[in-house]
């Protein structure tokens, strides 16, 4: 088979020869026309048809014969054309010409001879071909590798071009590449078959129709054409046409026939090219085509197809319409020789299609299979499945083909279509720079995409997986080492600079942009990620478990903030400012509300008394250490990142240092409102030399003053928390912050308040309290301050008047009147100070880790730490007893502009509280920041005109603004002692403070570290003079105490505002709770105004509704003054944003620890505690669950962050976790019910009915009260037990246990052996152990024992006979209920337990008092008469008296042990055998004792009438005392008048408690229960 390249570049140069012969001596027209047409067709095919190597079938060599003469190459081509591309340019042309010429000479010698046998000719020609065949095949392969690359490159998208590729093995070559006799040993086989075929039929039918064809004339391929005469040439052609027809197959008669043949052949052979584009399809879907296991088979087939045609006669005419090729074995005709060859192969091989190896899509072969198969089935060689049609097999084979292709993709494609050229050859063709080499297997590729595809193979292999895994592990190790080196460098910088160093978030962005390192590493498994989102997804693997079980490990994981937090961070993305000393990018301060939220969380837990110190990284406003040189005013930032070394001073219990007690906290703007200046202009600070800046969002925290406890007997145990969200600062505010640092490296920062600068809260604890160099330069933010509304006069306490704010502020308030909350306030909630943030003025370096103090986890962002700490928040026990009152964190949405409509509410609240003697409410007002409502004993007590720690200093740095006058309003009296106390704890130096009337402090200058406040370094600004208003007296001691805790230093403050105080001990701010919500959060949360009642915490949307509601409180007093004595704390508002993000329950009951998301729910819950008579159960105070099922807000953080997922609600008694509080409610009810049962004496028999029983069914831990006596299975209800008996034990024998009560069960005989009780004295056996106990007392061997035994035997006989009579009345089968008199038999004695237990109170006392024994038996805990089986209330025949038995008893033994004399049931039924002996019965006067009222009746009629009065009680009495048949009926001790007594007695059903007059009615009724 030849390509178009092969034809154009033939070894024989046929085209060139033809063109030259056409110019010099033109060939005959048919030949020339044929050749021209073929040339044109070949050129067109070279452009339009895919390369030859893409053809799925072998080409017929007929298309090459017009170029050839009747020379040796003519015979060689059919044999070798199919196995090479016939690129023979490398052969020597002269040698081939000589071979052709010598062969022509041989032909000329035979010219005059008679044509010999064609077999001999063929044999001779074939031998001559052998001399050239092998060499030509090798040369052809070589020429193909060197020149056929262009077409081969198209056969696969990514050809493999590895070095030194070996030729493809013969077994793996596709069908169209095999069939050429490359092996010399196979030639003989081919020729033998050929000779046999010709010998069998010299004129084979495959060309019998073509004998009359004229011999075709072919041009010579060389110049000998000119030397030969025309007649000679024609005769030779004719002769060779006859003689060589067997080799040529009788084709190529003229141009039209050749064209038609080629068209037919192309139509069949190239149908893949038109559909699947040839080689691409062949490579993908026909990879497994290996139809010939041996190349000799194909060579044999091709030899047959081309050489076996017999010669045809010259006289035969040409029939173009007939099929020229006829199979000798089956007679099938073919028009194309290739189809005929393929068909012949089927006959020459037993098993053509090795379906385990390949499958050939051949229409002709399929046709043959259909014709030959008949009923034959087609079998798949791989799986053995058979098919009746080849099409089904073909479809089935496609499945295996796909599997094979999948396997081939996992390994290098060794079954290439054609032998690939060597690497050196490809380099010669394409150049040495255009190859891609696989580093694993050293294989090269022309395209990078091919290399990528190839490398996937190595990725799927096990060894390659290990290599890749090792490579990835090396990458991780390198990343870890790199991070470790970075951490080491950071530690070195810390040691050099004295402060921790951390890359800021912006620097991480730089690393992402420029380095593309894997900077996100999982702390659990060490895997690194380039993006945070990838790390989040990865961490879900580690956090799917319970976070409380993996607490220690969870804390080591990198915290992943939630998506909502990310979105919020984008709203106030920190700005990049500058680099300093090649350090990290500096960022501006983010919102101070985030700082305050950290602070509030810290105080939330510290106030609750958790022993663990507050996490330093949670501290709200931290600062990087300023330059050590106090004169070096380099810019630095009051950063959000906390300094690990700096700590908050912790204020505990009003600065008393008492742990776990409530703190006294004042809100930020409380005292400032009382001392706010009347008309201050805007401050314009003078710029500092080196632009010391601070973010305007940072705010001065006023010093936390512990308002004296209103209850003087308790020293600050209960915090008096006043809170007001500070109003938004006006837009014009500038900052001057110049902070000096002490030598110890500790810095103190005071965040200025929104309006005033006077009050301060120390934000750091001075680690070096005794240091004399503890100078702090505190930033001061000047802001326009509105006039004070609450502290203008001394009488603000009496008639709290509210000044109207300025017009501009009022207009803004009106605009936002509907967008402000008066947040719900719990009685026990701590203050969260809302600190609105302003504009970012400057950003400076910060170098701090945000580290969680609890688990040691460090974070690069504060927000991540906040989200992380929510995990610890949920793990903390909410009901801990380490603190007296629970501190509930609540965050006020510090919307800067408070609702204008709330002013009326504030006034109303003040009036109400003054009227009721309660503390005045706190309110959110722009001008009124806090009202200190005092208790009745100090409500009228004014303070002197001093304001300590609350003064607003109007002094601006550098004297650019004159000091404003500060009118001091009334402040609570308890603030002064606290102020003094705080000052008293400060180590004082001998530097003079200014001149101040109280505490020796100048007005407008607060002593801070004993610095002369009047002598500031930049003292070009006069100190503001503050007119002092009346201040409560109790404020001064607290103020002094706070000052006393502050370490004083000898250095003067540079630009520090007056009134600033250094950081005291950590106790000072132990429970200082501050929080704020950013403006974005406030905008989101702003909605309709909610007004909350300060008494009960109930919220209202309308102010009028709140006013009306508060009138109800004026008409009632607190239920429990003890309980609310310390509930003077006004809860702060809870921001909806905090609820949504944190998912925490913010309102907690101080008594039981239950948390609620709204104060109204807490109010409803606290009402329950007031009803002690309803909830007096043990442990109610510890683990009470609200009656109203609380539906906690769904934790959004848990949904977004699986690290905090799990059961966050736990039972405080057993520690069991629950997802929802409703489940905990049910669980706690079980605890209460269990405690009730433990306290009850009859807890084992108490059957909780109704709702209580249904609650028991809801839990698996509760006791199952109904037990099956047969199989021991327990059930919650009697109905379930009955259904169990009906379904499971329907056909099983009944074992009458303690719960047997119904007479209907006696209808079925016992089918199970019942254990007997043997008497040790006499050896007799009894069914019931009570009989043995009585027998031990009344043993026959003892005195009087024989009579008792006889009476007992008669009693048993009566008990067995009576049910028979009853069952007869009911219509039951007498045979089934036939009584057995013998007491020793189980069937007879089975009725004994049921009968004997009928007496609840025993028999009536006889003369000898023996009735005490049964009576005592009835009083056993189980309510049974000493019978363990408990069938005491058996209704059937228990009370039927035996007259004969009574007659035999002596008078002193009138009382029978079993007490059958007064049995009510069945008394009217007499034993027939005993009727004749009634006259002998000696009867004693009967009496009846009522169990209810202890009355005694002589007649049964009177007793019956008396019982009717108790009928209602008897009917509804719960059946909680098994063993009592009629419950309240006393039987007579004698048998006199037994028949008459039965009429007046009542029989009670033990199932439902219904009473009946006769036993028959009771038996019928009980049948309804038993079905």
UniProtKB/Swiss-Prot annotation:
Biased composition (Polar residues): 770-781, 799-808
Entry-linked SUPFAM superfamilies: beta-beta-alpha zinc fingers
Region (3 X 5 AA repeat of P-H-D-D-K): 199-265
Primary location group: nucleus
Domain of life: Eukaryota
Localization of this protein: Nucleus; Cytoplasm
PROSITE patterns: ZINC_FINGER_C2H2_1, ZINC_FINGER_C2H2_2
Compositionally biased region (Basic and acidic residues): 35-56, 80-99, 169-186, 193-215, 223-241, 592-614, 809-820, 940-1070
GO MF term set: zinc ion binding
Residues in Sequence repeats: 942-946, 967-971, 987-991, 992-996, 997-1001, 1002-1006, 1007-1011, 1012-1016, 1017-1021, 1022-1026, 1027-1031, 1032-1036, 1047-1051
Family listed: Belongs to the krueppel C2H2-type zinc-finger protein family.
UniProt-recorded name of the protein: Paternally-expressed gene 3 protein
Organism: Mus musculus (Mouse)
Gene name as annotated: Peg3
């Amino acid at each position: 088979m030849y390509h178009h390249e092969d034809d154009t570049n033939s070894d024989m140069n046929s085209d060139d020869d033809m063109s030259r012969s056409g110019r010099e001596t033109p060939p005959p027209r048919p030949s020339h026309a044929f050749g021209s047409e073929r040339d044109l067709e070949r050129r067109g095919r070279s452009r339009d048809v895919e390369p030859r190597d893409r053809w799925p079938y072998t080409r017929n060599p007929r298309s090459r014969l017009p170029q050839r003469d009747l020379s040796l190459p003519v015979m060689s081509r059919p044999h070798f054309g199919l196995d090479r591309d016939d690129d023979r340019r490398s052969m020597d042309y002269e040698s081939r010409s000589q071979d052709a010429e010598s062969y022509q000479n041989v032909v000329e010698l035979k010219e005059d001879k008679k044509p010999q046998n064609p077999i001999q000719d063929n044999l001779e020609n074939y031998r001559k071909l052998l001399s050239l065949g092998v060499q030509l095949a090798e040369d052809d392969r070589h020429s193909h590798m060197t020149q056929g690359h262009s077409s081969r490159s198209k056969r696969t998208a990514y050809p493999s071009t590895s070095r030194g590729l070996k030729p493809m093995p013969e077994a793996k070559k596709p069908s169209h590449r095999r069939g050429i006799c490359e092996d010399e040993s196979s030639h003989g086989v081919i020729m033998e078959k050929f000779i046999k075929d010709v010998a069998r039929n010299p004129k084979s039918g495959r060309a019998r129709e073509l004998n009359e064809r004229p011999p075709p004339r072919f041009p010579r391929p060389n110049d000998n054409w000119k030397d030969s005469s025309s007649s000679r040439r024609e005769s030779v052609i004719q002769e060779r046409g006859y003689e060589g027809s067997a080799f040529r197959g009788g084709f190529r008669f003229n141009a039209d026939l050749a064209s038609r043949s080629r068209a037919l052949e192309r139509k069949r052979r190239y149908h893949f090219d038109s559909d699947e584009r040839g080689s691409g399809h062949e490579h993908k879907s026909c990879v497994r085509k290996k139809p010939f296991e041996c190349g000799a088979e194909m060579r044999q087939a091709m030899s047959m197809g081309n050489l076996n045609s017999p010669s045809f006669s010259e006289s035969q005419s040409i029939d173009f319409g007939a099929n020229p090729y006829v199979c000798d074995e089956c007679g099938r005709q073919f028009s194309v020789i290739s189809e005929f060859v393929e068909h012949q192969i089927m006959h020459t091989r037993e098993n053509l299609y090795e379906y385990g190896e390949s499958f050939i899509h051949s229409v002709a072969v399929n046709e043959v299979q259909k014709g030959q198969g008949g009923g034959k089935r087609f079998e798949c060689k791989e799986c053995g499945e058979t098919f009746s049609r080849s099409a089904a097999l073909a479809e089935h084979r496609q499945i295996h083909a796909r599997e094979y292709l999948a396997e081939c993709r996992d390994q290098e494609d060794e079954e290439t279509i054609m032998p690939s050229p060597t690497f050196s050859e490809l380099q010669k063709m394409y150049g040495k720079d255009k190859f891609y080499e696989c580093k694993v297997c050293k294989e090269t590729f022309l395209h990078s995409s091919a290399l990528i595809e190839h490398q996937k193979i190595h990725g799927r292999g096990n060894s390659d997986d290990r290599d890749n895994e090792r490579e990835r592990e090396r990458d991780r190790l390198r990343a870890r080492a790199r991070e470790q080196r970075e951490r080491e460098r950071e530690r070195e910088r810390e040691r050099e600079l004295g402060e921790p160093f951390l890359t800021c978030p912006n620097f991480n962005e730089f690393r992402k942009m420029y380095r593309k390192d894997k900077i996100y590493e999982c702390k659990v498994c060490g895997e690194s990620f380039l993006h945070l989102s990838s790390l989040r997804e990865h961490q879900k693997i580690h956090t799917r478990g319970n976070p409380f079980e993996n607490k220690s490990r969870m804390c080591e994981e990198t915290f992943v903030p939630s998506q909502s937090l990310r979105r919020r961070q984008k709203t106030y993305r920190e700005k990049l400012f500058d680099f300093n000393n090649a350090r990290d990018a500096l960022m501006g301060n983010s919102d101070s509300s985030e700082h305050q939220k950290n602070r509030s969380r810290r105080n939330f837990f510290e106030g609750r008394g958790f022993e663990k110190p507050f996490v330093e990284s949670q501290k709200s406003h931290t600062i990087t250490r300023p330059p050590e040189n106090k004169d070096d005013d380099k810019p630095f930032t009051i950063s959000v990142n906390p300094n690990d070394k700096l700590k908050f001073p912790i204020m505990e219990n009003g600065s008393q240092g008492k742990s776990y007690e409530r703190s006294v906290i004042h809100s930020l703007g409380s005292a400032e409102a009382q001392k706010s200046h009347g008309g201050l202009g805007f401050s314009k600070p003078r710029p500092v030399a080196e632009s010391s800046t601070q973010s305007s969002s940072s705010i001065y925290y006023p010093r936390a003053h512990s308002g004296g406890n209103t209850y003087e007997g308790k020293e600050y145990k209960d915090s008096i928390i006043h809170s007001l969200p500070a109003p938004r600062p006006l837009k014009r505010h500038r900052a001057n912050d110049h902070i000096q640092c002490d030598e110890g490296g500790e810095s103190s920062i005071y965040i200025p308040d929104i309006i005033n600068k006077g009050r301060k809260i120390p934000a750091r604890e001075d680690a070096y309290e005794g240091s004399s160099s503890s100078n702090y330069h505190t930033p001061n933010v000047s802001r326009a301050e509105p006039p004070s509304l609450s502290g203008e006069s001394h009488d603000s306490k009496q008639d709290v008047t509210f000044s109207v704010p300025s017009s501009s502020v009022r207009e803004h308030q009106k605009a936002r009147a509907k967008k402000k909350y008066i947040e719900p306030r719990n009685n026990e909630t701590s203050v969260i100070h809302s600190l609105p943030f302003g504009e970012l003025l400057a950003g400076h370096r910060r170098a701090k880790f945000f580290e969680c103090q609890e688990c040691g986890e460090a974070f690069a962002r504060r927000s991540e730490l906040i989200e992380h700490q929510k995990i610890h928040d949920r793990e903390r026990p909410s009901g801990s007893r380490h603190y007296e009152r629970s501190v509930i964190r609540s965050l006020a949405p510090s919307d800067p502009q408070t609702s204008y409509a709330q002013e009326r509410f504030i006034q109303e609240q003040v009036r109400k509280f003054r009227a009721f003697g309660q503390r005045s409410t706190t309110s959110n007002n722009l001008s009124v920041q806090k009202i200190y409502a005092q208790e009745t004993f100090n409500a009228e007590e004014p303070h002197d005109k001093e304001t300590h720690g609350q003064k607003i200093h109007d002094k601006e740095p550098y004297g650019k603004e004159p000091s404003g006058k500060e009118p001091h309003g009334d402040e609570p009296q308890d603030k002064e002692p606290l102020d003094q106390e705080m000052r008293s704890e400060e180590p004082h130096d001998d530097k003079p403070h200014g001149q101040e009337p109280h505490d020796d402090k100048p007005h407008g200058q607060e002593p801070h570290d004993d610095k002369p406040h009047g002598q500031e370094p930049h003292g070009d600004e006069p100190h503001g003079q503050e007119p002092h208003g009346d201040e409560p007296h109790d404020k001064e001691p607290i103020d002094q105490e706070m000052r006393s805790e502050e370490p004083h230093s000898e250095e003067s403050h540079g630009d520090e505002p007056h009134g600033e105080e250094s950081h005291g001990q950590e106790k000072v701010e132990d429970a200082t709770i501050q929080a704020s919500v950013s403006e974005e959060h406030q905008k989101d949360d702003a909605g309709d105004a909610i007004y909350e009642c300060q008494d009960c915490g109930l919220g209202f949307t309308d102010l009028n509704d709140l006013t009306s509601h508060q009138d109800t409180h004026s008409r009632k007093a607190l239920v429990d003054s003890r309980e609310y004595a310390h509930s003077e704390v006004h809860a702060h508002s809870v921001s909806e944003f905090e609820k949504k993000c944190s998912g925490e329950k913010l309102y907690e009951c101080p008594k039981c620890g239950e948390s609620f998301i709204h104060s109204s729910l807490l109010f409803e819950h606290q009402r329950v505690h007031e009803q002690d008579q309803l909830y007096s159960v043990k442990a109610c105070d510890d683990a009470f669950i609200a009656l109203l099922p609380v539906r906690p807000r769904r934790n959004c953080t848990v949904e977004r962050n699986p690290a905090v997922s799990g059961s966050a609600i736990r039972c405080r008694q057993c520690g069991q976790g629950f997802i929802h509080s409703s489940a905990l409610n049910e669980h706690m009810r079980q605890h209460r019910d269990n405690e009730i049962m433990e306290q009850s004496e009859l807890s084992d028999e108490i059957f909780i009915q109704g709702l209580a029983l249904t609650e028991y069914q809801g839990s698996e831990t509760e006791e199952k009260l109904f037990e099956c006596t047969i199989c021991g299975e327990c059930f919650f209800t009697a109905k379930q037990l009955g259904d169990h008996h009906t379904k499971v034990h329907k056909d099983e024998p009944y074992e009458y246990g303690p719960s047997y009560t119904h007479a209907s069960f006696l209808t079925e005989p016992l089918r199970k052996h019942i254990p007997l009780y043997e008497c040790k004295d006499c050896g007799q056996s009894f069914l019931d152990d009570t009989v043995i106990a009585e027998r031990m007392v009344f043993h026959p061997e003892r005195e009087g024992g024989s009579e008792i035994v006889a009476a007992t035997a008669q009693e048993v006989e009566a008990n067995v006979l009576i049910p028979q009579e009853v069952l007869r009345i009911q219509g039951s089968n007498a045979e089934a209920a036939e009584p057995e008199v013998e007491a020793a038999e189980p069937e007879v004695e089975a009725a004994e337990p049921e009968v004997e237990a009928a007496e609840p109170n025993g028999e009536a006392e006889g003369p000898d008092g023996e009735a005490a024994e049964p009576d005592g038996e009835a009083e056993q805990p189980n309510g049974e008469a000493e019978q363990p089986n408990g069938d005491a209330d058996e209704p059937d025949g228990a009370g039927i008296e035996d007259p004969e038995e009574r007659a035999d008893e002596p008078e002193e033994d009138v009382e029978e042990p079993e007490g059958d004399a007064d049995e009510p049931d069945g008394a009217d039924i007499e034993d027939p055998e005993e009727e004749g002996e009634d006259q002998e019965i000696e009867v004693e006067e009967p009496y009846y004792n009522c169990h209810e009222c202890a009355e005694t009746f002589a007649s049964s009629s009177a007793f019956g009438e008396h019982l009717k009065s108790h009928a209602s009680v008897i009917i509804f009495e719960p059946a909680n005392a098994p063993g009592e048949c009629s419950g309240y009926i006393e039987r007579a001790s004698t048998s006199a008048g037994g028949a008459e007594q039965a009429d007046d007695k009542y029989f009670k059903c033990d199932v439902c408690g219904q009473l009946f007059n006769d036993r028959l009615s009771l038996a019928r009724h009980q049948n309804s229960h038993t079905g």
